[in-house]
């Protein structure tokens, strides 16, 4: 019996080896604990700097059907920016002020993705009848939407989609 106790005692005091900290798998990103509400954001409205505000405003208003929600003028009364709205979506376009560094190419690497409750086919017909040109669509996508894509006068890409 004494031998048994000794073996048992030896087993219970045996230390287990742990992998070094650097060999552990990467930890998952830490959750904020507040459900992502640390900023208490209510909305987000992108703002695009455009080369010709009148041309862009006409395109969004007359081709796509956005409504002007608000305008901003400079000290001389020139419109320098507008807020546009269609349904629950709003964004702003503003005249490029041509300051150093602002003469960059517009619209590169950026796409506005909008979801609609309307028929994408009907929207495509309306856009084309208003003088707009589609880049693609209407197309059934493998992820379960039907969409159209177009490009505004400054190169910003827009996709309008509806779930099938």
Regions found by a protein language model. Name each.
Residues 3-47, 58, 63-151, 161-164:
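Vicinal oxygen chelate
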Residues 49-54:
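Short acidic-aromatic low-complexity motifs
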């Amino acid at each position: 019996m004494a031998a048994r106790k000794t073996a048992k005692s030896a087993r219970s005091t045996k230390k287990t080896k742990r992998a070094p900290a650097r060999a552990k798998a990467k930890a998952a990103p830490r959750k904020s604990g507040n459900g992502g509400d640390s900023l208490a954001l209510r909305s987000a409205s992108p703002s695009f700097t455009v080369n010709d505000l009148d041309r862009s405003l006409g395109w969004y208003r007359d081709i796509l059907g956005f409504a002007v929600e608000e305008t901003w003028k400079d000290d001389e009364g020139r419109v320098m920016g507008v807020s546009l709205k269609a349904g629950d979506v709003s964004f702003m376009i503003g005249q490029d002020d041509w300051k150093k560094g602002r003469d960059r190419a517009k619209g590169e690497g950026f796409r506005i993705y909008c979801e609609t409750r309307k028929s994408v086919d009907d929207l495509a017909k309306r856009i084309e009848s208003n003088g707009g040109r589609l880049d693609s669509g209407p197309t059934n996508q493998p992820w379960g939407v039907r969409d159209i894509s177009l490009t505004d006068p400054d190169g910003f890409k827009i996709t309008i989609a509806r779930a099938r």
